[in-house]
Regions:
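Acidic-and-aromatic substrate-binding clefts and catalytic sites of carbohydrate-active enzymes
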Residues: 33-35, 150-156
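Substrate-binding/active-site clefts of carbohydrate-active enzymes
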Residues: 3-7, 14-136, 140, 161, ...
Length: 166
C-alpha cells in the first residue's frame, strides 16, 4: 500500500455490533471479533506508523444500536440498558416518549436509537473523560476519527472531539 502512495487507512466502524456494517454500535470499547482483537488493532497501528501511514477510525456518535450495552433492548448484556430501566446509567443518553417503547431514533429507524449529544454523561463518556472513547482509541494507536453523519452532530460536539484529537 505504501508503494502505491497510500498514507491513510480509513477503517469503517470496527466496534462490536449486531450487524456486519457496524453502524449500530453495541460497545465502543470492544472491537468486533470478526475483525480481530484490540492487540491486532494496536499492531496494525504500530505497523502503519513505521510505514509512514495513519489509521483513522469511523465514529458513529449520534446513535447506537438498540442491541447495545447502552440501550440493551434485547437484554443481551448483563448491565441495565436504557430500554430496560430508568435507573440505567445510560437512560439519560436517550429521549423516550414515553419510556420504554417510544424513543427518538436516527431517521426513524427503531434499531438505531438516537443519542442526546447534549447529555453530560454521554459527552464525558465519548469525549471528555480521561478514559473517553476518543482518548482510549487514540492511545491504542488511532491517528484520528471520521465522524459518521457529522452534519447531524452539533458543532460544539465536533469541536470538543477536534480539541481532544489535536
Amino acid at each position: 500500500l505504501r508503494d502505491m502512495g497510500v498514507t491513510t487507512l480509513y477503517l469503517c466502524p470496527i466496534f462490536e455490533s449486531a450487524s456486519n456494517h457496524r453502524y449500530n454500535t453495541a460497545d465502543y470499547t470492544k472491537i468486533d471479533p470478526m475483525l480481530g482483537t484490540e492487540e491486532d488493532f494496536r499492531t496494525l497501528c504500530a505497523q502503519a506508523e513505521t510505514r509512514g501511514m495513519r489509521v483513522v477510525l469511523d465514529g458513529v456518535f449520534n446513535h447506537t444500536g438498540s442491541q447495545s450495552l447502552y440501550f440493551n433492548d434485547d437484554g443481551f448484556y448483563p448491565t441495565l440498558g436504557a430500554a430496560q430501566s430508568q435507573d440505567s446509567p445510560y437512560y439519560d443518553w436517550f429521549s423516550f416518549h414515553p419510556w420504554p417503547r417510544e424513543y427518538d431514533a436516527w431517521w426513524g429507524i427503531r434499531t438505531l436509537p438516537a443519542v442526546r449529544e447534549d447529555c453530560p454523561s454521554y459527552v464525558d463518556y465519548i469525549i471528555e473523560n480521561e478514559n473517553s472513547i476518543i482518548r482510549r482509541w487514540l492511545r491504542a494507536g488511532a491517528s484520528g476519527w471520521r465522524l459518521d453523519v457529522a452534519d447531524e452532530l452539533p458543532d460544539w460536539f465536533i469541536e470538543k472531539i477536534r480539541a481532544v484529537v489535536e
